[in-house]
Amino acid sequence: MILLPQEIIRNKRDGKTLSRQEIDFFIKGITDNSVTEGQIAAFAMAVYFQDMNMDERVLLVSAMRDSGQVINWQSLNLNGPVVDKHSTGGVGDVTSLILGPMVAACGGYVPMISGRGLGHTGGTLDKLDAISGYKTTPDSLDHFRKIVKEVGVAIIGQTGDLAPADKRFYATRDITATVESIPLITASILSKKLAAGIDALVMDVKAGSGAFMPTFEQSEALANSIVGVANGAGCKTSALITNMDQVLASSAGNAVEVREAVRFLKGEVVNPRLHEVTMALCAEMLLLSGLAADIKEAQAKLQKVLDNGKAAEVFAKMVGALGGPADFIENQDNYLQKSAIVRPVYAQHSGIVQSMDTRALGMAVVNLGGGRHSASDSIDYAVGLSGILSLGESADSEKPLAMIHAQSEKQFSEAQRAIQSAIICGTDSLQAQTQVYRHIRLPDIS
């Protein structure tokens, strides 16, 4: 059977179901450059409009995963499961820095391959880059495997060896208005995650004003797709749909979020929302990977490693193993950049925080220099927001909406206006919000 890229595009354009051979051929062509940019764009648009069924999505993810190296952990004789978490992104979402060490301290191995900031959402790699000396690109995949075995967790960026088809595919989607396709989002996320050779995966799919997906229904559709496809590709996976109607942590930025993560791990300052979401994700990871028999046991194990300092110790070891300071956990302020200006922003009218345009707050951080408008932009790790009020908290002349970390008066003034517009105060008392909306497991997928 002779396969041609244009015929595969035609079949999908016309709403036909693609075969394994067609999908494998097309993804191989993306990897070896025998498929052109125009053909990738046409294929992406055909999928965008005609969708893919669950079988096609599984085949697409598997082909993209296998386009490069798939990490093998069996030769290391690990004495625990290999498990990971992925978030669709939000503002103040510092869970990865806390969750990885917690799960590792409970006996799991967490090879986390993370990304950089995208639009208004922060990136885990950018946060880690704020730590002096930390290398998000290890010397080799063998070095990465060695750190995971010895420490229990390592957080790095994608290497060229893992799912190379995704890099080219995504670059084309980014400039052809096909990023939003759920089958293609599913394939992009899972190809990289499954190439890490994990046994289990927990997805954190955000919903709300700061989420990647604009509606709850779309967040739910993405969660269902990822759970169904990942399990179909042989990786035990479940998802939590979590609240992104306000900033998750008390801070948003890079150094400011790292500082909050360290203080959380040390038990110094614990934001209740961040604690609830992190504990829920960690517990799901322990349950899915067999490290706990039930939710009560999982929560007890997790709280224990926070209380006895073991999770903080694992974080310190990871930072040291990847080139950061050996005493970072004790002396983080010596190694994290500070901005020239740290000053409060107050509400224009006193009241109770009613709502938050979380996306606008994320963009305020980007405009301070803490994120990128284009991929080539450099980041100022010192800037951001801290002490951000929660929904239902009172703001007045004594209690600011947030602290702005800026490098100039102009930056401060622009951020001040953005924050005052994004956080709405009124007179109504608010009930505490649910942070975890739904758990989605394989039996839930119709």
Swiss-Prot record:
GO BP, sorted A to Z: pyrimidine nucleobase metabolic process; thymidine metabolic process
UniProt protein name: Thymidine phosphorylase
The keyword Transferase is assigned to this record: yes
Source species of the chain: Psychromonas ingrahamii (strain DSM 17664 / CCUG 51855 / 37)
GO molecular function: 1,4-alpha-oligoglucan phosphorylase activity; thymidine phosphorylase activity
Assembly with partners or alone: Homodimer.
Similarity comment: Belongs to the thymidine/pyrimidine-nucleoside phosphorylase family.
Catalysed reactions, semicolon-separated: thymidine + phosphate = 2-deoxy-alpha-D-ribose 1-phosphate + thymine
InterPro entries, sorted: Glycosyl_Trfase_fam3 (IPR000312), Glycosyl_Trfase_fam3_N_dom (IPR017459), Glycosyl_Trfase_fam3_N_dom_sf (IPR036320), Nuc_phospho_transferase (IPR035902), PYNP-like_C_sf (IPR036566), PYNP_C (IPR013102), Pyrmidine_PPas_bac/euk (IPR018090), Pyrmidine_PPase_CS (IPR017872)
Gene Ontology CC: cytosol
